[in-house]
Swiss-Prot record:
Induction: Not induced after bacterial or Nod factor treatment. Signal peptide: none annotated. Required for early signal transduction events leading to endosymbiosis. Acts early in a signal transduction chain leading from the perception of Nod factor to the activation of calcium spiking. Also involved in mycorrhizal symbiosis. May be involved in the regulation of the calcium channel responsible for calcium spiking by mobilizing another cation, and thereby altering the membrane potential. Its main location: nucleus. This is Ion channel DMI1. The lineage of its organism: Eukaryota, Viridiplantae, Streptophyta, Embryophyta, Tracheophyta. GO terms for cellular component: nuclear membrane.
């Protein structure tokens, strides 16, 4: 029976499927199924074993603190049914699993994550990383605090035991001792808190420096918002804000130093309070003394107190070093500001010069001479140069300014702030110098400066004198500036003076005397005592001046030069005179003069002349028109330069010059280089009456280069002329001198060494002095004459109308006349007598040059003293051009 039961049990076992041994891995939450070996398989003797495992489709769940997020679980699916029913055999006892087998089985059961799951895990890791840093920061903060709470709890327990044990003592001695102990305990607690605050303050900068960039991520995580990956890191943003703060606010450095000092005092006081037994007020005071004086910590006792005091003293030394650096920088910056000319000029009635050029030296000289009579003045120069450089250039002039102060400021005349810095609204005169560049750019800059001056809100008290480079740009500047603008066209002034000096040798020296303030110059003034007098009487009413014209009040202030003798001076009229200074002349009683008998000689007729232009100027068309008005018919103008003939015709036509409409002169074109000898030798240099060496347009931007070419041309022409002696066509010379038979001065100028009159245009006044001393040229015209004209117009804007008329080809002009027109040889006359005789020719005699003197005398003194005159003398007159 028992045997049958055993067999039936064996049959039941054989009919059942193979048992699965299940082993659970608690750490990985996995379930491993191990199937016993099948007896039908060949494993060793009986066959091989087959292992089957059942897994669910869920993802492996890692703890959240490891960085990989968990997914929701899915229901476990039952294993699929086997394809074949197992053979009902009694399996052998399975071999127990070893440790190695267990590891192999476990590793084989771990699923390999796909690429998408890896990316998802990385994103989850990057998202949870701020939490990790937040936990770290919280741990750093909470661990000391928890230790402090534990310490305080222990203290409270001890206090409780002490209080319970000393109740009898407290009842006998009162509550005073208990209160003191409680206060001591409170102080100990506060010192502990102070110590933790100090430690936390020391650790906080390092933590912020390390993890400051993660703070926005933590904030975004707490707010449940997505972070912007393109945001600038917080560390860079803070550095940028600090940089902007120090750049914008001028007192940022001082404020930062003050905050650092207060922080060091407060931090040091807190640290001292934590390590000493004193009060908080005493700790703060000691902290201040350590900051102010590093030697105060020498007497401290105790290790903690010494460490804290030394640290505070070191910080104090650093702060005081920073303070000294800031003070030194502030002083240096202020000194540099003063040295560089950035401070404001507080002046009134000064002359303001805008710009910088080679004319500035002679301009300052003339203005200083003009201010000599009033004890000096103030001249302010505003230019786009360093103040030190300007002052060095002015010091090189080696000129005595005679009490006049020259103040230089660095800035741009185009900026209103710089104009206000030099008190532009309070200046009595403003001079705008042309820039050292081509004419169009220079005039365009002058126009912008005039617009800037017109934009001054306070208005302008004085007038503006603008130096122009091109005559065509003058109307535009006057249109923009209005009545306050007076223009001086430098190129045009020199060109017209060159023509006048070429036709009348010696006239340049006279113009130099009249335009400069060293001798006689023009003045306009009202004299009420001269009202109702005829002009012929006014002419001899000034012992120390020579009247030249009248400013007619009834005609809108028009200046009439050389008026009619019968003109009666009316109320409001002013008299134009030539005098040494504005305070050196006054009307006096009428002197006794005698007209007498004198020769009535008419002006000789004009004869054709031959003139050579070497070089090409921008305004050469204007010079040709002036020559057309001055020269006699049949004259020739030779033009020798490198500009092709067709290009010349085009430029002359652009200047509105009708070449075929010229009646008095004939243009002869020659192409060549004026600094090459063989080109000059092709010209009949010995046949010209006058040779004008012009500053060439191609090199006008460089003063030194232009002067070098002019000097080379001058020397070559003189050498060629000397080699061609004794041949000379004297026709033109004899024709010119026929009307001046006794004029030894003109003969001396023209026939010296049998050479033509050469007028050179030298731009630099220093080069001009060298040429004048060497006497290789009859006369040299330079920018110094333009500077004189600018200074004269700056002193009185009305003089500009006088100069414009005298420089023009029409109207009154300055001439040199021989003595035979006014007297007989060795006749004894005073200067007043000669002035009266000159009125019969509608001329105003303003000076003379004696035969034995080199320079002419304008506005001579002692006009009523008679003297003997020679026919070799010449007189300087203002004559009508009719």
């Amino acid at each position: 029976m028992a045997k049958s039961n055993e067999e039936s049990s064996n049959l039941n076992v054989m009919n059942k499927p193979p048992l699965k041994k299940t082993k659970t891995l608690p750490s990985l939450n996995l379930r491993v199924s191990v199937t016993p070996p099948n007896p039908n398989d060949n494993n060793g003797i009986g066959g091989t074993s087959t292992t089957k495992t059942d897994f669910s489709e869920q993802q492996w769940n890692y703890p959240s603190f490891l960085g990989i997020g968990s997914t929701s679980r899915k229901r476990r699916q039952p294993p699929p049914p086997p394809s074949k029913p197992p053979v009902n055999l009694i399996p052998p006892h399975p071999r127990p699993l070893s440790v190695n087998d267990h590891n192999k089985t476990t590793s084989s059961l771990l699923p390999q994550p796909s690429s998408s799951s890896i990316t998802k895990q990385q994103q989850q890791h990057s998202t949870s990383s701020p939490i990790f840093y937040l936990l770290v920061i919280c741990c750093i903060i909470l661990v000391p605090y928890s230790a402090y709470l534990q310490y305080k709890l222990a203290k409270l327990k001890d206090m409780k035991l002490q209080l319970c044990g000393q109740i009898d003592f407290c009842s006998r001695n009162g509550k005073t001792s208990i209160q003191e102990e409680v206060d001591d305990d409170d102080n100990a607690d506060s010192r502990t808190i102070a110590l933790y605050i100090v430690l936390f303050t020391l650790i906080l900068p390092f933590v912020l420096y390390k993890y400051l960039d993660y703070l926005p991520q933590i904030i975004n995580f707490l707010r449940r918002t997505e972070s912007n990956k393109e945001d600038v890191p917080l560390k860079k943003r803070v550095a940028y804000m600090v940089d902007v703060f120090f750049s914008i606010y001028p007192y940022a450095k001082l404020l930062a130093l003050l905050c650092a000092t207060l922080f060091l005092i407060a931090f040091g006081g807190l640290a001292l309070y934590a390590v000493t037994g004193g009060s908080m007020a005493e700790a703060l005071w000691h902290s201040w003394t350590y900051v102010a004086d590093a030697g105060n910590h020498a007497e401290t006792e105790g290790t903690g107190q010494r460490i804290v005091s030394v640290s505070i003293s070191a910080g104090g030394m650093l702060i005081f070093a920073m303070m000294l650096g800031l003070v030194s920088d502030a002083i240096s910056e202020k000194v540099d500001s003063l040295r560089k000319g950035k401070s404001e000029v507080i002046e009134r009635n000064h002359v303001l010069i805008l710009g910088w050029s080679d004319k500035l030296g002679s301009l300052l000289k003339q203005l200083a001479i003009a201010n000599k009579s009033v004890g000096g003045g103030v001249i302010v120069v505003l230019a786009e140069k360093e103040k030190e450089e300007m002052e060095m250039d002015i010091a090189k002039l080696e000129f005595d300014f005679m009490g006049t102060s020259v103040i230089c400021r660095s800035g741009s005349p185009l900026i209103l702030a710089d104009l206000k810095k030099v008190s532009v609204s309070k200046a009595r005169a403003i001079i705008v110098l042309a820039a050292d560049e081509n004419a169009d750019q220079s005039d365009a800059r002058a126009l912008r400066v005039v617009l800037s001056l017109a934009g001054v809100k306070e208005g302008l008290r004085g007038h503006v004198v603008v130096e122009m480079s091109d005559l065509d740009n003058e109307p535009l500047v006057k249109l923009v500036g209005g009545e306050l603008i007076e223009t001086v066209v430098a190129h045009d002034v020199i060109g017209r003076l060159m023509i006048q000096c070429a036709l009348q040798p010696g006239l340049a020296q006279i113009w130099e005397d009249i335009l400069g303030f060293e001798n006689a110059e023009f003045y306009i003034k009202r004299w009420p005592e001269l009202d109702d007098l005829l002009f012929k009487d006014i002419l001899i009413s000034f012992p120390d001046a020579i009247p030249c014209g009248v400013k007619v009040a009834a005609d809108g202030g028009k200046i009439v030069i050389n008026p009619d003798d019968n003109y009666v001076l009316r109320d409001g009229d002013e008299v134009l005179v030539i005098a040494e200074d504005d305070d050196t002349y006054a009307p006096g009683p009428l002197p006794e003069v005698r007209k007498g008998y004198f020769p009535r000689i008419r002006d000789p007729p004009k004869y054709p002349e031959k003139i050579l232009f070497c070089g090409w100027r921008r305004d050469i068309d204007d010079m040709i028109m002036v020559l057309e008005a001055f020269l006699a018919p049949g004259s020739e103008l030779w033009m020798f330069n490198e500009v092709p003939e067709k290009e010349r015709e085009r430029k002359l036509a652009a200047g509105e010059l009708d070449v075929f409409g010229l009646e008095n002169i004939k243009l002869v074109h020659r192409e060549g280089n004026a600094v090459i000898r063989r080109h000059l030798e092709s010209l009949p240099l010995e046949t010209f009456d006058s040779i004008l060496i012009l500053a060439d347009e191609s090199v006008e931007d460089s003063v030194a280069h232009s002067d070098s070419r002019s000097l080379a041309t001058l020397l070559l022409i003189r050498d060629i002329q000397s080699r061609r002696l004794p041949y000379r066509d004297t026709k033109s010379t004899s024709l010119r001198l026929s009307g001046f038979s006794h004029n030894s001065w003109i003969r001396e100028m023209q026939q010296a060494s049998d050479k033509s009159i050469i007028i050179s245009e030298i731009l630099d006044s220093r080069t001009r002095n060298l040429v004048s001393v060497s006497r290789i040229s009859d006369y040299v015209l330079s920018n110094e004459l333009v500077s004189m004209a600018l200074a004269m117009v700056a002193e009185d804007k009305q003089i500009n109308r006088v100069l414009e008329e005298l420089f023009a080809e029409e109207g009154n002009e300055m001439c040199i006349k021989p003595a035979e027109f006014y007297l007989f040889d060795q006749e004894e006359l005073c200067f007043y007598d000669i002035m009266i005789r000159g009125r019969t020719r509608k001329e105003i005699v303003i000076g003379y040059r004696l035969a034995n003197q080199e320079r002419a005398i304008i506005n001579p003194s002692e006009k009523s003293v008679p003297r003997k005159w020679s026919l070799d003398d010449v007189f300087v007159v203002l004559a009508s051009g009719e």
